[in-house]
Amino acid sequence: MANDAAACAERATNDMLIGPDWAINIELCDLINMDPSQAKEAVKVLKKRLGSKNSKVQILALYALETLSKNCGENVYQLIIDRGLLNDMVKIVKKKPELNVREKILTLLDTWQEAFGGRGGRYPQYYNAYNDLRSAGIEFPPRTESSLSFFTPPQTQPDEDAAIQASLQGDDASSLSLEEIQSAEGSVDVLMDMLGAHDPGNPESLKEEVIVDLVEQCRTYQRRVMTLVNTTTDEELLCQGLALNDNLQHVLQRHDDIANVGSVPSNGRNTRAPPPVQIVDINHDDEDDESDDEFARLAHRSSTPTRRPVHGSDSGMVDILSGDVYKPQGNSSSQGVKKPPPPPPHTSSSSSSPVFDDASPQQSKSSEVIRNLPPPPSRHNQRQQFFEHHHSSSGSDSSYEGQTRNLSLTSSEPQKEEKPEDLLFKDLVEFAKTRSSKANNNNRSL
């Protein structure tokens, strides 16, 4: 035990240290306070280290001596005087040592003599050493505020008990009671409701004073809950504290998420549905509809010329007796066509636009025209009955001749029609040939 403090002083002034090792210095103070008899050996080691030629060892010895004077009391003050450390320090300053060593010695001497009351104080030896250097014309560094409270009395057992008691009271103050847990739950509910009503398009609303205060309260409650969980032995209080901690974490996490989303271009309610893409699509739909309508109109306008019958085509039907050409009304052009009476409401000889009629009237009119046409010569009996029926009902074909005489295959180039007399002559010749061939067949069979 007698060598513990001395060995600690050796380690505190080891030249391998970069700077003062405060853990070793405090350990040295504890050893001397537990056994004041070891102070003598420790001061002896420090005196030896102070006379070293290595400035690093000297500065380490001065720091260790300063630590002992602040923490070990009257025994060390007297040992510094008795061991002649004050005279050694004055000699070192007069020899002009390293600047840091010189400044440290001057600061210690000035602080000590001021703390002990100067010339008329308890230890006038400190003042004498100070005055000796001052008389030699050596300027002392200016005093600092830390030098005024240089000495601190050694800590005693009652003080330690008081510190422990204060620490326990602080822990009790930071814990939570059942009433405070209920109050914290109310704060959590209010903050959750306010975050639920938060407008994502207005991130500044999170900076409202009420929300800021509630968030701060919740964070304070969270710290106190952690202290409660780690210290309490009440199971009911522990369960409620854990439940409160979960709610606090949930609401604070939601607040942080909203704050993070608001700080970045967010996809909040207003920013998540920007209209530009939809507006562009709608405009494109309108343009497509308009273009489709225009295309349909152009298609209808161009469909009539492309469907015009070519000369010599079989699209029309010719009445052999009258020589007139009949066309189905669906394929006929609106120009130059005179409709049979009664005229339809959409017929106009001067209109250049296409006429769109319903399919059912066109089909009925076309079928009516087809029924008025005679059968082909190959069907002789039906053709003869058709002519007899027509002569008996109308007496002549003059009405159809008058109605269809001016019909043409195309509106631009009227077709050259054959004379009715020629057509009638051809039809009669063909009819006579048919009768003669049938008569010959009958004679052969007889």
Curated annotation (Swiss-Prot):
GO biological process: protein transport to vacuole involved in ubiquitin-dependent protein catabolic process via the multivesicular body sorting pathway
Species per Swiss-Prot/TrEMBL record: Arabidopsis thaliana
Tissue: Ubiquitously expressed.
Composition-biased stretches (Acidic residues): 284-293
Positions with biased composition (Low complexity): 347-361
Family: Belongs to the TOM1 family.
Compositionally biased spans, kind Basic and acidic residues: 414-423
Places the protein is found: Cytoplasm; Membrane
Protein name: TOM1-like protein 4
GO CC terms of this entry: cytoplasm; membrane
